[in-house]
Amino acid sequence: MTRQAVPKPAYEDLVDCQSAMFEWAESFDSKDWDRLSACLAPTLFLDYSDIMGKKWDALPVEEFIGMASSPHFLGNARIKTQHFIGASKWTQPDEGQIVGFHQMRVAHQKYGDDELKQVLYHGHAHGKATTYYRNVGGQWKFAGLVPDVRWTEFDCDKIFEH
């Protein structure tokens, strides 16, 4: 059986995409929306069918940041997360785009008080994520995400209830 060659990105481009992915995850978890804005492409492809039942082909960056920073989502100061990225593989379907495939575990904790002492719920999502990167003005930017949640633990479904 022969395998068809899958185009792979150059090492320097891959490192730049890993950096954009790190900035995306860290800005989500630290709720640093300016930092998030700096690593994103002008529009994003998002398929959140698994987690929100929604999909966007070209969501403007401002709308994405507004959604992410909403008090009903990650902008809620009583919700803490960690987006942990495991093993990855990468392809480059064309000169201006790179696609990453990553093992993911996302830990969530929701508190009942502003001092973050009373834990109401905790839940973890396990699966993989397909991420997209676009070369914008010579710099690789995070340009899309398709989470694939395989299973969850604890009260993951209650974290974003309001």
UniProtKB/Swiss-Prot annotation:
Q: What induces it?
A: Expression is positively regulated by the transcriptional regulator wor1. Expression is down-regulated during biotrophic growth within tomato leaves.
Q: In which pathway does it act?
A: Pigment biosynthesis
> Which residues are involved in binding substrate?
Y48
> Where is the catalytic site?
H83, H108
SUPFAM superfamilies xrefs:
NTF2-like (SSF54427)
Q: Can you cite a GO biological process for this protein? A: melanin metabolic process
Alphabetized, the UniProt keywords read:
Lyase
MF terms from GO for this chain are: scytalone dehydratase activity
Instruction: List its EC numbers.
Output: 4.2.1.-
Question: Which InterPro entries has this protein been placed in?
Answer: NTF2-like_dom_sf, Scytalone_dehydratase, Scytalone_dh
The superkingdom listed in its UniProt entry is Eukaryota
Please explain the role this protein plays, according to its UniProt record.
Scytalone dehydratase-like protein; part of the gene cluster that mediates the biosynthesis of the bianthraquinone cladofulvin, a conidial pigment not required for virulence but that plays a role in fitness and resistance to environmental stresses including UV light and low-temperature stress. The pathway begins with the synthesis of atrochrysone thioester by the polyketide synthase (PKS) claG. The atrochrysone carboxyl ACP thioesterase claF then breaks the thioester bond and releases the atrochrysone carboxylic acid from claG.
The record's similarity note reads: Belongs to the scytalone dehydratase family.
Question: Can you say what this protein is called?
Answer: Scytalone dehydratase-like protein claB
